[in-house]
UniProtKB/Swiss-Prot annotation:
InterPro entries: Integrase_cat-core, IstA-like_C, RNaseH-like_sf. Transmembrane segments: none annotated. GO terms for biological process: DNA integration. It holds the Pfam family Mu-transpos_C_2. This is Uncharacterized protein y4jA/y4nE/y4sE. The keyword Lipid metabolism does not apply. Keywords: Plasmid. Residues 36-60 are annotated as: Disordered. It comes from Sinorhizobium fredii (strain NBRC 101917 / NGR234). The lineage of its organism: Bacteria, Pseudomonadati, Pseudomonadota, Alphaproteobacteria, Hyphomicrobiales. NCBIfam families: transpos_IS21.
Length: 504
């Protein structure tokens, strides 16, 4: 058409039709003029090849600085970002316009493509069923999940079979550790019903942090023994090279997005307790596995048979109960019944609990505490363990190290704050300790807390005598109840004379 450039496609059409038609017919079919057709027959070159190279239409703002300053900077620091080079050039040459950033970034990218260093290559792998399982941990802090209104600082242990895409996730309250790995891995293997030939994890650098050489060797041996129990060969990807675990790293993002969407549809990120949140995670993972159900069923026959029983998924430590009525373990102080003072206890550390044994007898289970990120010690206190001694020395409550952890519910702390503000310290401590003792003796912790809340909301102080009358009345003042048993003849009358005659 007049006024339009001839395209390469039009020339190809013309040359095609020219093999069987005249110049005029071929030109008409290619939508070009007769004169253009005769000219194209002589040139035998595509129109795009006849275009002269496009030159610059405006001055090059980097003409005097790129080779002289930018290139030496790129050679000296190959990993430097283009935006850092841009800021440095503006600092050196304030007269440069700020709009050169994109030009500089394109020029640096082109220079690196020609003169840059060789980059690491990722080699895609083919996978066989039943061959490889992957484990990793992912941080769930960005989801802002809360338990009973309190933020839940937790990780998610994530296991995945590479071939079928089977997944298992387990909520971890502490950081990365062998205990968390052992518990999560065994749950995953027993859930799928078999074990792969190889198990790959990262270098477990977080679990090895702050350990001495002997402890690191012990942890390595325990990990190898765990894999040997399930006849798996342990492998590790190189430290800091996430793409070597890419089959699970990418799955982290998909799983977290699924959890985030489920939380949005749920309408709240708060859960009543940890058990309900774990059930919520299990349901999401189950739905994801259902989408790969056929492939998972196809991989199961290729998995190794599981052993008869699980192996240990805990650490065992021996502690001695001190005169303070508890023991310190991993920067956390735990209270135990005072009758255990002086005894040596075996403690099994799980991710979320401690099982306490004396000899081979299980004594009690304690929730596991965590030291603060700043290194400050924490306490796990059960007031039932110390209340009998505290009643003898109520003033010890005033400056007690773990006073804040002693109160089983916020209402008791509110009551103590109100009492200490309006009464002498000795009287306030005495009343608070007696309130805790009342809850301990009568098993009315929740009911007493509700009554304290009503009293404090009415801007009154707790009345110990009145509360004792409600929850712990004096047995001597209880009314005598006389129970009169009914005569058996009255029951026979209810049965009727006809039935009585038949029985006779």
């Amino acid at each position: 058409m007049p006024g339009r450039h001839v395209t390469d496609h039009q020339m190809r059409l013309f040359m095609k039709y020219r093999q069987t038609h005249s110049v005029e017919v071929a030109a008409a079919k290619a939508s070009i003029s007769r004169a253009t057709a005769f000219r194209m027959e002589k040139e035998q070159r595509l129109p795009s090849q006849n275009k002269p190279p496009r030159g610059r239409r405006r001055p090059d703002p980097l003409e005097h600085i790129f080779d002289a300053e930018v290139v030496p900077l790129l050679k000296a620091a190959p990993g430097i970002r283009a935006v850092a080079v841009y800021d440095e050039m503006l600092r050196r040459h304030p007269e440069l316009p700020e709009g050169i950033r994109r030009t500089l970034e394109r020029r640096i990218r082109s220079w690196r493509a020609v003169h840059g260093e060789a980059q690491e290559v990722i080699f895609r792998q083919t996978h066989e069923p039943g061959r490889l399982g992957l484990s990793d941990f992912t941080d769930m802090g960005s989801l802002s999940v809360t338990i009973a209104g309190q933020p839940l600082d937790h990780l998610l242990y994530h296991f995945r079979l590479v071939w079928s895409g089977f997944e298992h996730a387990h909520v971890i309250l502490g950081g990365e550790s062998f205990v968390a790995l052992a518990e999560g891995l065994q749950n995953a293997l027993w859930s799928v019903g078999g074990s792969p030939l190889y198990h790959r994890s990262d270098s477990l650098s977080a679990a090895f942090r702050n350990l001495d050489a002997d402890a690191k060797v012990d942890l390595t041996n325990r990990y190898e023994e765990l894999c040997a129990h399930y006849r798996m060969t342990p492998t590790r990807n190189n430290k800091g090279v996430a793409h070597e675990n890419g089959s699970i790293e990418s799955s982290h993002g998909h799983l977290k997005n699924a959890v985030r969407d489920a939380l949005l549809m749920r309408g709240t990120r708060d859960f009543d307790d940890l058990r309900s949140y774990r059930a919520f995670i299990d349901e999401i993972v189950s739905r994801r596995n259902a989408a790969h159900g056929k492939r998972i069923d196809a991989e199961r026959p290729h998995l190794q048979v599981l052993p008869e029983r699980r192996t240990t998924d805990f650490e065992e430590v021996v502690v001695t109960v001190s005169r303070t009525g508890g023991f310190a373990l991993r920067k956390v102080f735990y209270t135990v019944p005072s009758r255990l003072i002086g005894h040596r206890l075996r403690v099994r550390l799980f991710d979320d609990r401690l099982d306490v044994f004396i000899g081979g007898t299980h004594l009690l289970t304690l929730p596991r505490g965590r030291a603060h990120a700043s290194g400050k010690h924490d306490q796990v206190v059960n007031y039932h363990h110390v209340i009998h001694s505290l009643r003898k020395k109520p003033m010890a409550l005033l400056n007690l190290v773990y006073r804040d952890k002693l109160f089983p519910r916020p209402e008791y702390r509110r009551a103590f704050d109100a009492l200490i503000e309006q009464l002498p310290d000795r009287q306030a401590c005495k009343i608070t300790v007696e309130l805790l003792a009342l809850a301990h003796d009568r098993g009315c912790e929740r009911e007493l807390a509700e009554e304290l809340a009503r009293t404090l909301d009415a801007r009154k102080l707790p009345d110990l005598m009145a509360l004792r009358a409600i929850f712990g009345p004096d047995p001597d003042q209880l009314p005598t109840v006389h129970v009169q048993l009914a005569s058996l003849n009255s029951y026979e009358a209810l049965m009727g004379s006809a039935y009585a005659g038949e029985a006779a």
